[in-house]
């Protein structure tokens, strides 16, 4: 790639977290030299379940949707967002489909750089941990909203689940005697 293209890629990455918050510009610059660029048309799958992923994807332009195995929409992502990290944290094993919903220009960051930054840079790893935490919170909120019960099983006291008193024995009774 020409130096102008590399500079543009570096400038773009540095506008978005976690790259904008990292204190190691020389490493990000080295990484940019190893990026791949991919153009994907609207409707094309980018990552499919039961395959191996070797990249962290940065959306330079366009939008994608993340689908569960049953084609259920999990979320939409757009310019400046990253995907593919969940599979990289599972040694590349893909469980969700990522599909373009607009024509996309993607930067593909090799897994080696993702793993290096994830291990060596707290800002980088905390960024992805916060995303995972927020996704879990969103899933739990959705479960609570869809629950037909007055009390969610995820947050209710154990006492409220008991229908009869618990069985107990003295502490000097052996397991064999209790059985």
State where each predicted segment sits.
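The conserved cystathionine-beta-synthase
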Residues: 169-179
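Cytosolic regulatory regions built on CNB/CRP/Popeye-like sensor folds
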Residues: 1-165, 176
């Amino acid at each position: 790639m020409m130096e102008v293209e590399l500079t543009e890629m570096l400038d773009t990455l540095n506008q978005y977290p976690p790259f904008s918050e990292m204190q190691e510009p020389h490493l990000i610059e080295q990484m940019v030299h190893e990026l791949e660029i991919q153009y994907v048309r609207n409707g094309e799958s980018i990552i499919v379940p039961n395959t191996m992923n070797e990249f962290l994807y940065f959306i330079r332009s366009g939008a994608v949707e993340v689908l569960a195995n049953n084609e259920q929409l999990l979320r939409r992502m757009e310019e400046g967002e990253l995907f593919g990290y969940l599979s990289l944290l599972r040694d590349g094993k893909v469980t969700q489909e990522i599909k373009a919903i607009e024509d996309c220009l993607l930067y593909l960051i090799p897994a080696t750089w993702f793993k290096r930054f994830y291990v060596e840079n707290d800002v980088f790893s905390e960024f992805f941990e916060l995303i995972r935490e927020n996704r879990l919170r969103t899933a739990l909120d959705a479960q609570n909203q869809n629950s037909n019960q007055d009390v969610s099983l995820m947050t209710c006291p154990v006492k409220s689940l008991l229908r009869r008193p618990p069985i107990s024995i003295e502490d000097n009774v052996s397991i064999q005697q209790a059985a």
